[in-house]
Amino acid sequence: MSTSAAATLPLSVISKNLRKVFLSQKTRKIDWRYSQLKAIKKMMSENKDNITAAVKKDLGKHEFEIHQTEIVMIQTELDETISHLESWNKTEKVYSPLHFKPASSYILKEPLGVVLIMSPWNYPVNLALIPLIGAIAGGNCALLKLSRHSYNISKLLHGLLTKYLDPECFEFDCEGGAPYITELLEYKWDHIFFTGSVKVGKIVYQAAAKFLTPVTLELGGKNPCIVDKDTDIKLTARRLIWGKCWNAGQTCIGLDYLIVHKSILEPLIEEFKVVLKEFFGEDIKKSTSFARIISSAAAERLQQLFSMGKVVIGGEADIAERYIAPTVIVDPDLDSPLMQDEIFGPVLPIVTYENIDECLEFIQNRPHALTLYLFSRDQAIQDKVLDGTQSGSLMINDTLLHFTNPNLPFGGIGDSGIGSYHGKGTFDIFVHKRGLVQSTTKKFLDLPLRYPPYTPFSDNVAGKILGSGW
């Protein structure tokens, strides 16, 4: 039996209880929101070492990677939200047209209600807590479904969140599998925030459509990286290897494949070899700076990709230890899973091009990426790529860092997702902007010409008030 509170009661009861608490208006109070945000901050501060150890056990990541993505980013999001919550939540007075006078117009920021958040295993703290922070800031109740694949950190988070947060307003699950998720989607939620694969994202979207439930879908896909001939090969190689090997390539914004100018392919590959040795030593498997794959099954899937092109670097695997070496593949089969499916591992296929138009056509004929990368010092090339492509984000001459900026919207387009978040964007997802017009009851200000019977005079006056479009 699941240890989670969300699994010990029928979902019908959980849904009803959360709805009842929301309707009590408890979560609307700004003091309650601050108290819950500060509780998460306290939880992170008091349990940093335990969180680090649990993530390390699941993914084999170095403490540096864990701290940057699972600790620091949460602290940044909390600080940003706590500092600005009052101003974000403030009612806005907006201009009222002449025919409204003396009425006043406002935009209210109101909670959505009871929301469902479904988080993945690859960044199990970050991708669970940042949406939850937004849901709390917006004044909502929430059910958070943690991934059972990152079992150690999900189990720890389940216990900590249950301890630190208001138990009436939240439910957490860390063990429910596909049947539980299927049942979750049979209930009406006021918003669903899902992070995961395109395949499951489509299932979530279809289920939400039954209730016209709004969704945020943070998906993945194949993120291309263009490497122009006008680039610093040494610096480019360092940033590419760093971006591809962070979390052993298990990153939704990770570069999935390279499109390299034919003239620099060989020197770039040689520089990759130098950088890999510098970063991880002679035996990468022994390096504490290189993470492990989440499961043996995932490692086996990645190993199968080795045969779908020519391996020029790497190609080693230890399935029992969930180890896949950083592997570079040239001449990949374009119709194979290597070039059709999201890789989600340290396997990097390379295709080549000779002119930028050919390169852009290759990208345009594929689903829109969550992130597109470009390495080039040529401003004309940068402009052409920016104007000639669509993607959730575009990063030029570096990798991954855009994800850490709370002032940038993070999200996809098309197959890579719906909606964006981080910073104020996370708050905006979880509130409804409700229009309010407050009119007068003073009879002497009630213009008679608005009422029937209408006359040419009333039509003429209305035209002058409302403008030429009347």
From Swiss-Prot:
InterPro entries: Ald_DH/histidinol_DH, Ald_DH_C, Ald_DH_CS_GLU, Ald_DH_N, Aldehyde_DH_dom, Aldehyde_DH_NAD(P)
Top-level lineage group: Eukaryota
Compartments, record wording: Cytoplasm
Binding of NAD(+), residues: 196-201
UniProt keyword Cytoplasm, yes or no: yes
Catalytic activity annotation: an aldehyde + NADP(+) + H2O = a carboxylate + NADPH + 2 H(+); an aldehyde + NAD(+) + H2O = a carboxylate + NADH + 2 H(+)
GO molecular function: 3-chloroallyl aldehyde dehydrogenase activity; aldehyde dehydrogenase (NAD+) activity; aldehyde dehydrogenase (NADP+) activity
Active site: 218, 252
Broadest EC class assigned to this enzyme: oxidoreductase
Protein name: Aldehyde dehydrogenase family 3 comG
Organism: Dictyostelium discoideum
Classification lineage: Eukaryota, Amoebozoa, Evosea, Eumycetozoa, Dictyostelia
